[in-house]
């Protein structure tokens, strides 16, 4: 949880803490804990609003999290190549600078909105809301939110997504779930990417990586995938198709689901999180739609 480095203040919410803003109060250039709590409460409100939009339009929103270079963008490219003809997809890309990843996605014929976060090491719900103004939600079935490459902060911020997917690439080492538990506890699915490198990176043991994951009491599926070998994305594609079907069912029943927000972040979220922090698969009644 970034409660000391100040990166809770992002381009999406800085208007709330500027002079005259609703929560304008700082100490020694860093946001006070009470201000951070207020910002997170505002973030949670905006996330609920985002989720209402997704549910009303029948869109499944998935937040992709990983370290830099784990293969998030390449995974999206490969996914679009397979699902694109049958599933309408859009992507929100989060990076500190450049439009490189968004340009790669657009080259696949899919609408993509780039969010440049500046010094912020994660996306927040306000940033995502601003990006949604550039996306026709009636024209898509599936929205991927590619978060900033970071193994800590993204897990503590609800963006309005329905599911979290955490990537662990083979070159990173199989002990990452033990070293960075927060982001792996938040996952509804863990993908071990770059599986084609296993024969040459023999120190990486997928079974050991999964044991580290289970030691966190995670029940998330753990699948080894590769974008370079035909058929090795199938576990991911099956999971996506199942989630799309589940979203259709929830919408018909007027229900929604919330992602896991990790306790270290949730402690600062204040009253907005009371009664909302549930485990995997818990259904919630959707709030009333509004503009």
Task: Locate predicted features.
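Nucleotide-state-sensitive switch-loop elements of NTP-binding domains
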Residues: 12, 21-52, 56-65, 70, ...
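Histidine-centered metal-binding segments
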Residues: 2-34, 255-291
């Amino acid at each position: 949880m970034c409660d000391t480095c100040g990166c809770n203040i992002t381009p999406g919410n800085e208007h709330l803490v500027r002079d005259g803003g609703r929560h304008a109060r700082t100490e020694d250039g860093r946001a006070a804990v009470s201000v951070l709590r207020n910002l997170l409460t505002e973030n949670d409100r905006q996330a609920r609003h985002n989720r209402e939009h997704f549910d009303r339009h029948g869109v499944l929103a998935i937040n992709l999290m990983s370290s830099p270079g784990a293969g998030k963008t390449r995974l999206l490219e490969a996914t679009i190549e397979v699902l694109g003809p049958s599933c309408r997809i859009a992507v929100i890309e989060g990076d500190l600078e450049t439009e490189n990843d968004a340009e790669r996605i657009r080259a696949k014929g899919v609408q993509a909105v780039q969010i440049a976060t500046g010094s912020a090491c994660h996306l927040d719900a306000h940033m995502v809301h601003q990006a949604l103004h550039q996306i026709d939600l009636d024209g898509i079935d599936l929205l991927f939110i590619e978060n900033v490459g970071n193994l800590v902060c993204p897990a503590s911020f609800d963006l309005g997504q329905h599911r979290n997917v955490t990537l662990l690439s083979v070159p990173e080492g199989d002990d990452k779930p033990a070293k960075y538990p927060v982001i792996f506890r938040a996952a509804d699915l863990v993908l071990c990417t770059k599986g084609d490198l296993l024969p040459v990176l023999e120190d990486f043991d997928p079974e050991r990586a999964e044991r580290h994951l289970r030691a966190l009491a995670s029940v998330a599926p753990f699948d080894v995938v590769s974008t370079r070998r035909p058929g090795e994305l199938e576990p991911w594609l099956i999971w996506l198709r199942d989630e799309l079907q589940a979203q259709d069912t929830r919408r018909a029943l007027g229900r929604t689901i919330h992602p896991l927000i990790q306790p270290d972040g949730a402690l600062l979220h204040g009253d907005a999180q009371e009664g909302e922090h549930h485990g995997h698969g818990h259904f919630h009644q959707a709030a009333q739609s509004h503009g």
